């Protein structure tokens, strides 16, 4: 009988905090600037420069800790993690080992019908490293220090996950919670949320952990799921062949769907941690914790309950609309403006989702305003434009955030309700399509649809489809 194996997974999730300036200096954290333009002596590790802690970093981390049921450390401090690498100009990273900002929390996930708590071991603050660029010159790597000193919170889970489905559920719940707090945009493609997967396998029924590996270079949930399945299979193959799994860090190549060893996996003692001498401990009072707690927003679970009760929309729609705080804000703001929650939901669920998919965007990337969506819904409801024109206008609202009222006026897209002009067109359509007329009178209802289509085409989509249908039936009696 073949051996059965269990996968054991823990995650280290690095989240870039949404402060305007870096953790220990006043340099901008803006993404995408020209290389080495958001730097100063502090974040490039110049001798004699001294760090000054950004208070907002601490408050964001406290907010995340409270939202994930962690205990906030009342006196926490920073430590130096010593290592040499080109993207680390100080040759050490300021992090937290001995007294991290939060500990002992959990995130509750749901996979299928099963609920499970994933424990959080600790949450600590640290500074990000720079970025190595390997593809500019053939034989040289370049370093961009813009990212050096950007504030990170690292969320370390216990090894409580047993499948890629549980991992993705945990990451999605964590991302949604942090986005609702406004502490980070958590965009994997931009690196503001990064997950390292620590994975081992063991025979089913045993309690001892196997040898773990750490998987890096995972920049999407799909890549994370594929890396987990690939590493699980690799480790099982080694064990089945009587070989040992080496404790190491591996880099995942999503194009090849395989990984390769980067380096042996280090332990804490390899980094020679010692207390950071240039920063005093952070004393966190109960009053400070209470102030942060009081500012906590309405989270997704609370919104789901309220949406069903207040707006009477289907559970599935509510789940999609609340998945992103940005989408939830658009829904609520637009509904407040036009008073039509079900129609707002339909526009977001159908047309917005269609365009997000077409443009390979996430809901956080939406740039159109609630005011313009509300105007579009009002134009369609009033019959000023028909449904096909409304969809055409929405494409421009989505891409350019145009004012739909002005766009309709400037492009002459208002629905034609002039019966005299419509009857003239209908008479010509009937005369030009005798076979369709015969078919309709012979009982073929589809033939009427063809005549409606010809009429809409002749009037460049600006006719009222209901009125066209009504008049055609009257004229063909």
Pin down the residues of each PLM region:
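Basic, nucleic-acid-interacting segments
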Residues: 1-298, 315, 336-340
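Structural motif
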Residues: 3, 312, 335-344, 382-385, ...
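Core structural elements
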Residues: 190-203, 308-330, 341-358, 371-373, ...
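Extended, non-catalytic structural segments that build the interaction scaffolds
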Residues: 288-295, 332-339, 373-385
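M16/insulysin-pitrilysin zinc metalloprotease superfamily fold
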Residues: 337-338, 344, 352-367, 375-380, ...
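Strongly charged, low-complexity linkers/loops
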Residues: 364-374, 378, 387-457
């Amino acid at each position: 009988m073949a051996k059965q194996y269990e996968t054991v997974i823990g995650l280290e999730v690095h989240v870039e905090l949404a402060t305007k300036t870096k953790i220990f200096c006043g340099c901008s954290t803006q993404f995408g600037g020209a290389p080495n333009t958001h730097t100063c002596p502090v974040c490039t590790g110049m001798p004699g420069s001294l760090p000054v802690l950004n208070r907002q970093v601490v408050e964001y981390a406290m907010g995340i800790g409270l939202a994930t049921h962690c205990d906030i450390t009342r006196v926490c401090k920073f430590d130096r993690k010593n290592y040499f690498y080109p993207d680390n100009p100080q040759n050490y990273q300021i992090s937290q080992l001995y007294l991290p900002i939060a500990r002992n929390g959990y995130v509750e996930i749901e996979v299928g019908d099963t609920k499970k708590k994933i424990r959080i071991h600790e949450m600590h603050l640290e500074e990000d490293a720079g970025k190595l660029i390997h593809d500019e010159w053939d034989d040289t790597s370049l370093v961009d220090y813009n990212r050096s000193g950007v504030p990170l919170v690292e969320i370390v889970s216990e090894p409580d996950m047993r499948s890629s489905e549980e991992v993705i559920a945990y990451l999605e719940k964590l991302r949604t919670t942090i986005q609702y707090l406004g502490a980070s945009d958590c965009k994997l493609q931009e690196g503001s949320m990064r997950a390292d997967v620590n994975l081992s396998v063991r025979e089913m029924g045993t309690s001892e952990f196997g040898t773990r590996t750490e998987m890096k270079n995972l920049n999407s949930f799909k890549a994370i799921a594929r890396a987990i399945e690939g590493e699980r299979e690799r480790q099982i193959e080694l064990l089945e062949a009587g070989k040992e799994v080496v404790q190491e860090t591996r880099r995942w190549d999503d194009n090849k769907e395989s990984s390769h060893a980067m380096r042996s996996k280090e332990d804490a003692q390899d980094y020679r941690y010692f207390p950071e001498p240039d920063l005093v401990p952070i004393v966190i009072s109960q009053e400070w914790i209470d102030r942060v707690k009081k500012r906590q927003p309405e989270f997704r679970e609370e919104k789901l309950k309220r949406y069903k009760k207040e707006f009477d929309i289907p559970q599935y729609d509510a789940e999609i609309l609340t998945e992103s705080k940005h989408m939830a804000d658009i829904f609520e703001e637009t509904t407040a403006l036009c008073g039509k929650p079900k129609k707002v939901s339909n526009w977001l669920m159908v047309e917005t989702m269609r365009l997000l998919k077409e443009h390979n965007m996430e809901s956080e990337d939406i740039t159109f305003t609630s005011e313009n969506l509300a105007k579009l819904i009002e134009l369609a409801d009033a019959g000023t434009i028909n449904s096909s024109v409304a969809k055409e206008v929405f494409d421009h609202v989505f891409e350019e955030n145009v004012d739909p009222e002005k766009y309709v006026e400037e492009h002459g897209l208002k629905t034609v309700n002039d019966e005299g002009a419509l009857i003239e067109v209908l008479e010509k359509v009937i005369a030009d399509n005798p076979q369709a007329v015969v078919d309709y009178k012979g009982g073929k209802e589809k033939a009427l649809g063809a005549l409606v289509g010809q009429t809409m085409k002749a009037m460049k989509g600006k006719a009222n489809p209901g009125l066209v249908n009504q008049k055609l039936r009257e004229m063909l009696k």
